[in-house]
Swiss-Prot record:
Protein name per its UniProtKB record: Long neurotoxin 3
Subcellular location per the Swiss-Prot or TrEMBL entry: Secreted
Gene3D superfamilies: CD59
Similarity field: Belongs to the three-finger toxin family. Long-chain subfamily. Type II alpha-neurotoxin sub-subfamily.
Residues spanning the membrane: none
Record Pfam families: Toxin_cobra-type
Keyword Cell membrane: no
Gene Ontology cellular-component terms listed: extracellular region
Role played: Binds with high affinity to muscular (alpha-1/CHRNA1) and neuronal (alpha-7/CHRNA7) nicotinic acetylcholine receptor (nAChR) and inhibits acetylcholine from binding to the receptor, thereby impairing neuromuscular and neuronal transmission.
Disulphide-bonded residues: 3-20, 14-41, 26-30, 45-56, 57-62
Chief localisation class: secreted
Tissues expressed in: Expressed by the venom gland.
Amino acid sequence: IRCFITPDITSKDCPNGHVCYTKTWCDAFCSIRGKRVDLGCAATCPTVKTGVDIQCCSTDDCDPFPTRKRP
């Protein structure tokens, strides 16, 4: 499987059986810059924590960098 990986946001091969994930959360600059984003691959979908949104998928390049909604 191929997943986008931060910080370069380039598509890279991940080991067999892994999933791609997109993890987003707010930090001190969230209202100005938007949510922080972490893209990668993992053996299993990362555990959801309070204030962190995680989406996992299992097809090539299914985790593109999310677009910020404009007001």
